[in-house]
Amino acid sequence: MLARKALMTRIARLEGVKARVAPILYMEGACGVRLKADDDVSEIFKNGRASISLGYIGIHETINALFGDKHLYDSEQLRAKAIAIVERLRQAVDQWKDETGYGFSLYSTPSENLCDRFCRLDTAEFGVVPGVTDKGYYTNSFHLDVEKKVNPYDKIDFEAPYPPLASGGFICCLLYTSPSPR
């Protein structure tokens, strides 16, 4: 899988790095260990000591691309498909963790810049695709698209199945359009 290969490339960059490159971190205990100057730092990141996260954006747009542009919020079937995609991502990172000893995790990415940039790149490559690139941005991770106007409680309920899958973290964002929401 391409995502695993990319993350393993990041890990490989630590191989051969000696503790002396950052003595406060690796030799004086800031990382919870005291290595010798010529010790390889990569080993301390195994066994869950640190995480390397797979982030994702655009679950809403992915569902639209695969199943049409009915809104995810309005369809239990589409919601189930979206959750299944994120569950599969979580299973993958858990498997990679078991296979390598590195702390792979799934990060429900809050990345407005990336949501904008990737949509622009995809629009340039594939044109305007209704329900996918037509807004000019992708939705953050599992978030409810901001164009869907619901109250904050319904938004939280809609997003509730996803945080337990986000072993690398997530953000819950509520937008209030009034200084005194009711």
Tell what function each PLM region has.
Residues 1-66, 70-71, 175:
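Structured mid-domain segments that build the active-site/substrate or prosthetic-cofactor binding neighborhood
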Residues 6-15, 90-101:
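Flexible helix-coil linker/hinge segments at domain or subdomain boundaries
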Residues 13-27, 74-79, 99-110:
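Short, glycine/acidic-rich hinge or "gate" loops at secondary-structure transitions
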Residues 72-93:
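Short secondary-structure subsegments characteristic of cysteine-rich extracellular domains
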Residues 97-137:
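Extended amphipathic alpha-helical segments with heptad-repeat/coiled-coil character used for oligomerization
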Residues 125-161:
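Intrinsic disorder at enzyme termini
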Residues 176-181:
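Conserved small/polar residues in nucleotide/adenosyl-binding loops
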